Amino acid sequence: MTHNVAILGASGYTGAELIRLISQHPSITIKALAAERKAGMEMADVFPHLRHLSLPTLCKIDEIDFAQIDLCFCALPHKTSQEVIAKLPGDLKIVDLSADFRLRDPEAYEKWYGNPHAALEQQQEAVYGLTEFYRDEIKGARLVAGTGCNAATGQFALRPLIAAGVIDLDEIILDMKCAVSGAGRALKENLLHAELSEGYNAYAIGGTHRHIGEFDQEFSAIAGRPVKVQFTPHLLPVNRGILATTYVKGDAQAIYETFAKAYADEPFVELLPFGEAPSTHHVRGSNFVHIGVTADRIAGRAIVIVALDNLTKGSSGQALQNANLMLGEDETAGLMMAPLFP
């Protein structure tokens, strides 16, 4: 059976990544591509690396016949996404890649994103889209909210440990290095090559990064009490990848065994041999997550390192993984390509 999909926001990085992945999918066809400011253009003119694919001409959202669409990927900016999704057909399956439906509490959304939520009915309906932990809910969902790329990385490092009670919940430090593509394709002065290359800086210091809202929501729900991690992201002058170094108080061997049990049957999560450290090089362009555990020299402390590709597993790959479940397809369809190396 072939499923027809539409991609809204197809001219951004996550939209292009969705097209790349879906082009290898055995049973999904791209029926419509929307990009309001580039309507009428061909994808080959927006992203020349997709020139070999036969794709629909970019159009406006209101030009799409959603009666012909089985599932819609919404890769629009937050705030815009909720406005658009609220107007889409009520029976349409949707995977949203923005931040608009990740937080269940409307007050939390307003706190982190600065605006009241304009689609409260859809917000309450949405299922959080971290596939490995919400698989059953996603299968029956109409609207799935993709996670933040940083939020996904941190959760792969910490969710099983919090659930198993093998770490001190008040002693968690999360240090994350993020590729520049995570900031999107819009022109910004601080992301110009001359401003960014050959440098490295922290940002959103002091607990102000918006993805902390997801950490607070998810970790506290698992623990049954408030959990607050100390999180600082850093911007790297690279195109793809996130590397999270997590410092926790707990027995390193118990932590390793917890991961081994939690991820034993996960097709996209690779637990490295004890003491080995992941690299973003080894997950680039893939839907895989690599996790490493090392004992710290300080007794009773451990270091957990997680690497993933922010555009693939952190966004578009996760979105396709969720779409597979929603459409009744094999979860891994279109996603088992090997990472790009070197």
UniProtKB/Swiss-Prot annotation:
It is an enzyme of class 1 (oxidoreductase). It is found in: Cytoplasm. Keywords: Amino-acid biosynthesis, Arginine biosynthesis, Cytoplasm, NADP, Oxidoreductase. InterPro entries: AGPR_type-1, NAD(P)-bd_dom_sf, NAGSA_dehydrogenase, Semialdehyde_DH_NAD-bd. Its main location: cytoplasm. The active site is at 149. The keyword Oxidoreductase applies. One of its GO terms (biological process) is L-arginine biosynthetic process. Pathway: Amino-acid biosynthesis; L-arginine biosynthesis; N(2)-acetyl-L-ornithine from L-glutamate: step 3/4. Its EC number is 1.2.1.38. Gene3D superfamilies: Dihydrodipicolinate Reductase, domain 2, NAD(P)-binding Rossmann-like Domain. One of its GO terms (molecular function) is NADP+ binding. GO terms for cellular component: cytoplasm. It catalyses: N-acetyl-L-glutamate 5-semialdehyde + phosphate + NADP(+) = N-acetyl-L-glutamyl 5-phosphate + NADPH + H(+). The keyword Amino-acid biosynthesis applies. Catalyzes the NADPH-dependent reduction of N-acetyl-5-glutamyl phosphate to yield N-acetyl-L-glutamate 5-semialdehyde. Belongs to the NAGSA dehydrogenase family. Type 1 subfamily. This is N-acetyl-gamma-glutamyl-phosphate reductase.
